[in-house]
Regions:
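Amphipathic alpha-helical transducer elements in NTP-driven molecular machines
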Residues: 86, 193-194, 265-268
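Hydrophobic or amphipathic, alpha-helical segments that drive membrane association/targeting
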Residues: 1-120, 281-337
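Short pre-active-site segment immediately N-terminal to the catalytic Zn-binding motif
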Residues: 76-80, 125-141, 188-192
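An active-site-proximal "capping" alpha-helix that borders the catalytic cofactor pocket
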Residues: 89-93, 140, 190-212
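Catalytic Zn2+-binding segment of zinc metalloproteases
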Residues: 147-166
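Active-site-proximal gating segments in proteases and membrane effectors
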Residues: 49, 106-120, 182, 204-304
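Active-site His/Glu-centered metal-binding helix of metallohydrolases
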Residues: 134, 143-152, 196, 200
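Post-HExxH zinc-binding segment in Zn-dependent metallohydrolases
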Residues: 166-194, 201-204
Length: 337
């Protein structure tokens, strides 16, 4: 998305704008990326045959067929189609100072979800159920969350995850045991990546209550003010925070469940930790890493997180490396004619 960069710092919107949100000029994705996200991706790339599987998958499908498969049953959002959603989208792009406007589509499905997909040409799919459940501000948070997946270069791996899950559900012969190692690693990383983009969504909204309210609704379904209580949901999230290592065990259980996203209560707890650390306020005040500039502070945080994550990553790799080596040739042969 083209914009006048002005000074190399965030700045408030002008008096004529609809909100006092600070535009985060030139913000680098590393400003919001959760260190565990990067550590998990590093572990994923160490899985035997991962790179080869990635190449074979996209060589087999190709970008255009994948794009058409996602977009064939969806409506392109614009100033003429879903104009209010488009307005929210444009504002989120502006606040995060996204370098491009990515195609946004609305898909008719009651499932409350959204996703960013693609290879070289990323796009966003927004489910209509999400539009019906959430307020405009809550919906904008979801949209900003997906913009962040694109800006953080998550979409290639996100797309691969969806393809492997769908192939497995269809009984595709190469996805029974052979690709399980790669899929388990992708799911582990996918959940960590959501923590990064939750932060970006908050930066776009600059109102923690909006984000937590959206998560409350996504966790509990349709709601009204006299039936749910956001404060009670926050108390529930705080209980997770106080459980310490139990939260890490939850992530491991999710490997068995095959979830692509962490539980919403856990996400709220992680987000509150980040806000209370002071990092959120520093970014909104204009102190953040910028695109094209080195970020030594983030690199130090990443090293610390990678060290803390090492045992978990090693356990994951140990549990699937043998299967990957044994099944790798079978998986790859499934794509040969």
């Amino acid at each position: 998305m083209d914009s006048d960069k002005g000074e190399s710092q965030g700045k408030p919107e002008t008096p004529g704008d609809e909100s006092p949100k600070r535009i985060l000029l030139d913000i680098a994705p590393s400003a919001w990326e959760h260190p565990a996200d990067k550590a998990a991706l590093q572990a994923l790339r160490r899985i035997p045959i991962f790179d080869e599987v990635l190449k074979k998958m996209f060589g087999f499908f190709g970008e255009k067929p994948v794009r058409l498969a996602f977009q064939a049953d969806a409506v392109h959002v614009s100033n003429k189609q879903f104009p209010e959603v488009y307005r929210l989208y444009k504002e989120a792009l502006r606040t995060l100072d996204a370098p491009h406007e990515y195609p946004l589509f609305m898909s008719q499905t009651p499932m409350v979800n959204a996703g960013a997909y693609g290879m070289n040409k990323p796009f966003i799919i927004l489910n209509s159920g999400t539009r019906l459940l959430l307020t405009d501000e809550e919906l904008q948070y979801v949209i900003a969350h997906e913009i962040a997946h694109i800006m953080s270069d998550h979409v290639l791996y996100k797309t691969m995850t969806v393809l492997l899950i769908n192939l497995a559900n269809m009984g595709f012969p190469v996805v029974g045991v052979a690709a399980r190692a790669v899929l388990v690693g992708l799911l582990e990383w996918s959940r960590k990546s959501e923590l990064s983009c939750d932060r970006a969504g908050l930066l776009a909204m600059q109102d923690p209550e909006v984000v937590m309210s959206a998560m409350l609704k996504m966790a509990g379904g349709p709601t009204s003010q006299d039936r749910t209580n956001l404060n009670e949901f926050i108390v529930q999230a705080d209980a997770y925070r106080e459980s310490g290592d139990v939260a890490d065990q939850v992530f491991k259980v999710l490997n068995v469940l095959g979830r692509t996203h962490p539980f919403h209560v856990l996400r709220v707890a992680e987000l509150r930790d980040w806000v209370e650390s002071g990092d959120y306020d520093r970014i909104v005040s204009g102190q953040y890493a910028r695109r094209g500039e080195p970020d030594s502070a983030y690199e130090e945080d990443l090293r610390a997180a990678a060290s803390a994550y090492a045992d978990e990553a090693r356990d994951l790799l140990d549990s699937i490396t043998g299967a990957a080596m044994q099944a790798g040739s079978d998986f790859l042969s499934g794509f040969r004619k």
